[in-house]
Amino acid sequence: MFEYVKDLGLKPARPYTRRKMTDLIVLHHFAADASPEEVHRYHIGRGHKGIDYNVVVLLDGSAARGRGMAYAGGHVLNSGASRGMNARSVGIACQGNFDVRPMPAAQKGMLFRVIRDC
C-alpha cells in the first residue's frame, strides 16, 4: 500500500512522533504552487519538525511522502476544538491554490486514491 507515493528524502529537523491511531483524514491545499521541498523548508523555518503533512498530492497527479503514514502530523492548529487532532489524523495536502484555479483532474484522481488507501 502507498507504493505509488514517492520518497523525496525530506529529513526532519527533529524526530517525528509515531501516530498511535487514525480516525480522521484532514485535507489541505498549499495555497501556492510551492514544491514539497519548499514547504518542508518553510515549516522547519517556523520551528516545526518538518513538513506538516503526511502525504502531498502534486499538480501532475503524482503523490509524495511528507512525514509518512506512520507519524503524527503538524497540520492542524493544536488549540480549542482541534486540540489533539494531529495525533489521530492523516494530513493530506494538495499542491496548488484552488481559490484561484480548479484542481487538475489527475491530481483529483490521485487524491481520491490516497484517501481510499488510508
Predicted regions, residues:
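Active-site-adjacent loop/helix surface patches within enzyme catalytic domains
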Residues: 1-118
